[in-house]
Amino acid sequence: MFVTFEGIEGAGKSTAIDYLSDYLQARGHDPVLTREPGGSALGRRLRALLLDVRTGGLASRAELFLFLADRAQHVTEVIRPALEAGQVVLCDRFTDSTLAYQGYGRGLDTEYLRSLNTAATGGLEPDLTLLLDLPVRCGLERAGERNRSAGMVIAEGRFDSESLDFHERVRRGYRALAEEEPERFAIIDASQPPEDVVLQCRSAIEAYLRRRGRGLD
């Protein structure tokens, strides 16, 4: 099972993934936790470039192809082998981030982006996508506090420094994507306390499995 986690900055995706990993391990699974950018050795180098605020003047298409290079390597090196081995993969961001950020946020054509995503992934799509949704100002406040606490304001703050309008477009983009594919997406109210967010995510995964006559145990 391939589960992706999407949302604006500060939505709490990493926290939810960590809790769900513990939940799955308690039920005998060995989940693979990964992220974009940065899920492979190459990806970690690309992440440092893409998220650093000192990476100035990066053209939208240049940014796009760096993310796609990360994804192509990530799928080949990490995601597809894990799925073929029967493991559950929990991924912090995937193809929908490209549509939301480079499409709705940067204004690149979404159909063009879909075709590039397909090329980068070899057609691999998530089984379930959990969209952690919350107001933009709340998310940015959380992201800023997180990066300050970790000393990562410079190293990982490039997207946090985008305009409020940019992040509003990204959020609207995510919600539009969820409306287009309601069977794949579950919208999670990420403005709630972390424990409530995790419960929503867990319920969404269990509901997905019930629809397919499967269980976690």
From Swiss-Prot:
Nucleotide-binding in keyword set: yes
Keywords on record: ATP-binding, Kinase, Nucleotide biosynthesis, Nucleotide-binding, Transferase
The top EC class is transferase
The protein's Enzyme Commission number: 2.7.4.9
Q: Which residues bind ATP?
A: G7, I8, E9, G10, A11, G12, K13, S14
Catalytic activity reads:
dTMP + ATP = dTDP + ADP
Q: Name one GO cellular component term.
A: cytosol
Write out the GO biological process terms.
dTDP biosynthetic process; dTTP biosynthetic process; dUDP biosynthetic process
Q: What GO MF terms are annotated?
A: ATP binding; dTMP kinase activity
InterPro entries given in the database record: P-loop_NTPase (IPR027417), Thymidylate_kin-like_dom (IPR039430), Thymidylate_kin_CS (IPR018095), Thymidylate_kinase (IPR018094)
| One Pfam family of this chain | Thymidylate_kin
Give the family, as the similarity comment puts it.
Answer: Belongs to the thymidylate kinase family.
Q: What does this protein do?
A: Phosphorylation of dTMP to form dTDP in both de novo and salvage pathways of dTTP synthesis.
Protein's name in the database: Thymidylate kinase
Recorded source organism is Desulfovibrio desulfuricans (strain ATCC 27774 / DSM 6949 / MB)
* Gene, per the UniProt record: tmk
